[in-house]
Amino acid sequence: MEITAQMVKELRESTGAGMMDCKKALGEANGDMEKAVDILREKGLGQAAKKADRLASEGLVSVEVCSKCKKATISEINSETDFVARNPQFQALAKDATAHIQSSGIKTVEELNTSTLNGVKFEEYFKTQIATIGENLVVRRFETISADDKGVVNGYVHSNGRVGVLIGAACESAEVANKAAEFIRNLCMHAAAMKPSVISYKDLDKDFVDKEFIALRAELEKENEELKRLGKP
């Protein structure tokens, strides 16, 4: 049976699934609209599409570090609620996606969606997860850093899953790099706690430094005035 544009349009409007998914489902159903709806439902595609316009403002940060500490990936995957962010299935999804990003050398969300995970396109795999978990999920961003033989990388995610850090360092030799992994991880933990904006004070914006200096000087002058009033040196 010929699958017309009108049929695809009607199925898309009734299910919220993508146009190509609707066309494929109608083909499998030989034009039977009800059967096509069932096919989409079985694949979770209609449910995933209907959830796609719902705000995903919670979520998790996930970090994957290779065994030799030469490559590390950090990703942020959002959910609608904190409840789902604490769901073991969602946590496993975040971990699997981050590992896949690293092993595949993926650099953009577009590349991720068209890549293959467990024998299926990641986009389809992700839609299935949305349907199963029951909330809109979004891969917001990710980044991978790497090091050569004389370098080391490591990462850390705070226990609440909301803060993650990757750090890479160049070392004097491969021997030093092999011994530095734990130290770099501790640096990541420190950065997660203190939230520094730059690596060195030399990287600070001059206007920021000037404003901080003025504020500090005013604070010291006020403190000195108070000591003078109390007759203290």
PLM regions and their residue ranges:
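N-terminal assembly/interaction segments in proteins that build large macromolecular machines
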Residues: 2-233
